[in-house]
Amino acid sequence: MSFKQYLVEEVTRGLDETYKVDEAWAEDYPGKKYFDVHLSTIRDHEMATPTFRQYLGQGGMKILESGCGSGRWMAFFEQLGNRAYGVDDSWGPIRLAHRHDPDMNLVRATVLQTPYADNTFDAAFSSYVAEHFEEGPEALFREIHRVLKPNGLFFVVVPFNNAFRRFVVNPILMALWRLWKWRGRGLGFTEFRYTQAEMEGFLRRTDFEIVEVKPDDFFAPWQKGLFCDLCDLGCFVGYEPKPPYEFGPFGRAVAAAIRGLGPWVAAGGIFLVTRARK
């Protein structure tokens, strides 16, 4: 079953400031060089990249990214010869993207009610967005289904409730939450971490056909799932990790021990390729 993730309220409020940090970092990369930095990460480290090349590499497709952030995946899809459109409900990432590429097709809107007609897109992508709806992801999936053409592709990534989380991270987090509540500190909901069965159920109920399912993470030696888990634990003790995904001695030891057990054991996300049934 899924795991409902909470963080200290000060941390959840701080998540709203993420793009201020990103904007400050982006000052070092004027113009489209900002996207070049992100594209190198996608090209060299993201497990999802070969799958996107397989399905979208022929180009000529109209693609929606739902919850696009600052548009790094949009830039990648366009590099493959497609036309990308993005929706996000925050001005911060949209301003950041437009500052570096004014021609990007970005609009500010809720991902649950996008400003597009039925059957508009050949494909859609949602990366680490669906988990943030406390009522579940089905409303998001229904909206994406609406704007996709018949048999349109939908790629979706959400945090995965993997074995390392179920048996190690989650019990520690629950103990820390009890401690913080006892100390009178508030906790705020941040996300669900879903199982494969749950995600397949959500998607089938919203008229998507499952094509394939894969782990989502970075290729070794980077492991964004494990890095995020150590960050979640560290926020309770004042630990501030240093980007990009650099482990300390303890993190490197844990990563090395887990790596030989296969990609699913500590995968940060679950990546599903689906088609809209219409």
Predicted regions span which residues?
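A C-terminal cap/extension of S-adenosyl-L-methionine-dependent methyltransferases
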Residues: 169, 173, 201, 211-278
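A short glycine-rich, Lys/Arg-flanked "PGG" loop and its adjoining helix->strand segment in the class I
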Residues: 138-150
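A short hydrophobic/small-residue beta-strand
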Residues: 84, 154-155
